[in-house]
């Protein structure tokens, strides 16, 4: 398999952010690192994609945020998963399960 980072498919960024936050609250860089970790380096999320998505997801009520100090004593915005966010993650996980099954079926024919 190619070890180069892959472009995210439409609709996957929200799901990966929500999945990352299941582990606990994180700042933006932590979320980006977590996505890279849980995808085995397949997806690398750049700030230009991450922060607009975080802002939009906060407006949707899927995540909440608060300011705090990072591990190197710099101000950072920390994000956490909300109950509606957990519900959204569950729905997206089911949806992507159906999509991946259908694609696998199509590729086997």
Where do the model's predicted regions map?
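Intrinsically disordered, low-complexity and often Lys/Arg-enriched segments
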Residues: 1-2
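N-terminal helix-turn-helix DNA-binding core of bacterial DNA-binding proteins
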Residues: 6-49
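Basic amphipathic alpha-helical segments that dock to polyanions
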Residues: 50-57
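Beta-hairpin "wing" of winged helix-turn-helix
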Residues: 58-75, 80
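Amphipathic alpha-helical dimerization/coiled-coil segments
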Residues: 86-109
